[in-house]
Every structure is written in C-alpha cells, then in structure tokens.
Amino acid sequence: GLILCSLPLQGQSRQNISLKFMGLSFHPLSGRPNAKLMPNRLDPEAYFVVDLGALLSYEYFIIPEILSVKGIQGLYADCTAQLAGVTSIGLRARIFRIGRHRLYGGIGPTWIYRRNWYRLPGYVDTKYFEGSPTDKWQRKFLWYGGELEYKYALSPKLDIATTFVPGYPDLMAFAVGLSYNL
C-alpha cells in the first residue's frame, strides 16, 4: 500500500522548475534604523521597499503533488539596491488543492547574503547579519527558512505561481512567476 502511494500517477509530473520575479518587500517593524539608506523605499520609514530580482527553483516530488524537496537560488537588489542572494533547500507539502488552485508550505535551511552594508555611510548594525566591517559580504543562516506558494494551473504543464516568504519580524517578501512541470 505505502509503496503504491509513492509511485507517480499517470499524468502527474514528479518535477518542476520555476522562475519568479521579486519586486516588493515589507518590513513589519519598519526599516529603521537604516531606512534612509534604502533608495527604493515607498514610504519614509521603509515599511515597503522595491527590491527587484529573480528566483529560480527546482522541485522534485517524493509523493506526487503532496510532498517534495525544493531548491531555490535567488539574486536580487536588496533594500539598499546592492547585490544580494538567497539559497535554500527544504521540504514542502501541499496544504490544499481545490480544482486548479493549490497552496504549498515549505521549510528548510536558508542562506541569505548581501554586499556589506558597513560600506554605506550611516549604516547602523542591527546584529541580524553576520560579518565584520572589512568583509565583502554579510550573511545569515536560518535552519527554518520558510515559504508559502500559491499555484494556479493554466494547463497540465504550466502554472502561475506566487511566493510569500514570512520572515517576521524582519522582512516579508513576495514573488510572482511561472512554474513548468517537466
């Protein structure tokens, strides 16, 4: 019984690739004390900041449509418009499926890195990122990085996909793009 449940059903893809575009981040407690360093903030306290970039992901379903392993690589211009990135791998599970609508939740180790903000005049270290003033990069490792992903099936092979990263209280991020079932 259990072995049969893990075999792919005809018509169900066991893998997909996604390309999503980032564009908006939200700081629930504001961007203070570094809001003034964020040139693309949409308000004086940097609650909302435009940070353009892309996320490329590969997902393999252990149990088709139910449980998967997903890897994500992203590059973007961070809140100060400097190069930053994210690398993550984790487990994901389907929360619900209703017709063409699906919602997934995922969690796993995540590495976040950015050009060092110490180079920016007026930067105040909030102790969130690791790195000294002489390092080229600042970094953060999270054992528990997570995401929620909503997908709407356009066809059996192609989905519109949106991602929400709930990094409360520091940062919440949004991305939208396409997911292609291989």
What are these regions (language model features)?
Residues 55-57:
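Short, intrinsically disordered low-complexity segments
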Residues 1-18, 182:
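Bacterial Sec-dependent N-terminal signal peptides
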Residues 20-22:
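Short strand-turn segments of transmembrane beta-barrel domains in outer membranes
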Residues 14-16, 49, 53:
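N-terminal amphipathic/basic helix or basic patch
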Residues 24-47, 51, 60-68, 77-182:
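Outer-membrane beta-barrel transmembrane domain signature
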